[in-house]
């Protein structure tokens, strides 16, 4: 049998809930994604709580709450202690996302599910990988290799490939085949025939995706129209994910049009977010990387966007029309919720949603058709304690401090007794004479005598009072005192300034003291009141989610052509639609498990380990194929002297084989290649490529619905045997490796 693979959804199947899946490979348990929603519903984590202690490794795919939101809570409360793997941007931006969530919640509630320290603890030991980096696990995971690949949805977002004994398990959710301003498209189509593909059906029913140029024009025209009539524009956004694409669109448009309307990016960590993003250019699109290499122009040096970390700065901004991108996208908390309540009753204003709101949130309610004219909103804020409440609070705090001091003194006394009891050579403690005599009091009278408290008996171990003395011993060697090189390291001034400006340390972490500067730490309580908000402003939703549409999903799954397919994360209708399509056109083994339902997707193929004998390899001729080398081998299975299964040379002359062309030709790329060679080329009907006057190329083979390939493809050259025919054929052969 092949590698044993079982998949168990813990959250996020047959609905739009957060993503969390248990994948077991030969007994090694991966938790892939550990998401939560903006409602922080603990009931969603019950399946995870039952298996958290058995997890051996955690893989994170994207830096948003739906993929990483439950990680701090799971590590603090559920017993999750496995190592975590992610790309550098997912680690850094995910950390900032959780900071923003915590600070937003703490401002309006007594949020206690996790703290800043819990967030730091969860992220401090994340093992960071680069794209396509093969990381070999050890110990229980010996023989398993993991590697992140470009997903195209968010900065650093990953498709995970897990390999064991030559079989691939691909986890690909929330991917985007389209190239965007700051991201390249996914590389999912580069995988062929994996043993298992785990993917989502989120957009399986969405097929009318607008062209990027037209979408951007509608987006900018809608914003401009409301600004020009004196209205404000609110874009509820995530903390550090899809908002980056929106910032670039606005920045470039403002530069081209010369607009004077201010743009504000308002989150608790906006400055930190942009500072980190500036250093992640190698993770972005080719155009951004090339622009920086040639002109040193960083696309995220935002000249038209002002970064804010508190709403007071926005309130103090000059009056007039403005664009504000504020978190959270769900409108359940954060600055966006406050701004919506303030701006909703003005018909000149616009609330522009760029993604579908999470189920059960205010954003989802406002996106319904038709939108509501009134919404009931519970607004909460912290108010300082006063009067009797403040006195009671201070008394309680003083009582707690006294109890803590008493506990500390008792512990110290026990330690002192233990230290004296264990030191046989220690001198006897000096006894304090507690007798109060008239000579001591002297002429000061009874007033001084009353200072002494009756019943006070010094401990038997009391000693004469002394100033504390600490002996700081230093280590020496033959050359003198040993120095610590870390004491002389000069920190990067830019990082220091950035950290201080952003409210964190040089690693981007926030501590409780820094958080206290962002939050009012005076004694306070949460006051809540329900408001009926009149929704007179315009409500518009546009698709900037950065996900492939249904047609592209089907085409890519057909191209990948997995042996077994597992569908997750979509409503029931979309899941069943994609499942039936794949069963009919792509793969006979398609699974869509329920929560905590384990499906066994072990490969039906048998895998064996064999040794390549020296006799065989001495006659093999390799040919370069990208970063690898390939060769055709004729051999038979036998055993060497060490009784190991090996591939041995054939006893006689090997029979000739037909030439094999290795490679994957894209007709669009080949068209550009022929054009560079001076060949007149154009697309004809049915996807054919007309080359010159007489020759036509076309791909043929099994196809699925809407043209998606579902099997091996062939390339046909049609035309008379002429000079152009042979020239085009040679150009075609040059695109492959011949074995």
Curated annotation (Swiss-Prot):
It comes from the Eukaryota. GO terms for cellular component: cytoplasm; mRNA cleavage and polyadenylation specificity factor complex; nucleus; plasmodesma. Residues 411-423 have a biased composition (Basic and acidic residues). Keywords: Cytoplasm, mRNA processing, Nucleus, RNA-binding. Signal peptide: none annotated. Its main location: nucleus. GO terms for molecular function: RNA binding. SUPFAM superfamilies: Metallo-hydrolase/oxidoreductase (SSF56281). Disruption phenotype: Impaired antisense-RNA-mediated gene silencing. Early flowering. Disulfide bonds: none annotated. It is found in: Nucleus; Cytoplasm. It holds the Pfam family CPSF100_C. InterPro entries: Beta_Casp, CPSF2, Cpsf2_C, CPSF2_MBL, Metallo-B-lactamas, RibonucZ/Hydroxyglut_hydro, RMMBL. Residues 411-430 are annotated as: Disordered. One of its GO terms (biological process) is mRNA 3'-end processing by stem-loop binding and cleavage. CDD domains: CPSF2-like_MBL-fold. CPSF plays a key role in pre-mRNA 3'-end formation, recognizing the AAUAAA signal sequence and interacting with poly(A)polymerase and other factors to bring about cleavage and poly(A) addition. Required for antisense-RNA-mediated gene silencing. Belongs to the metallo-beta-lactamase superfamily. RNA-metabolizing metallo-beta-lactamase-like family. CPSF2/YSH1 subfamily. Component of the CPSF complex, at least composed of CPSF160, CPSF100, CPSF73-I, CPSF73-II, CPSF30, FY and FIPS5. Forms a complex with cleavage and polyadenylation specificity factor (CPSF) subunits FY, PAPS2, CSTF50, CPSF30, CPSF73-I, CPSF73-II and CPSF160. This is Cleavage and polyadenylation specificity factor subunit 2. It comes from Arabidopsis thaliana. The gene is CPSF100.
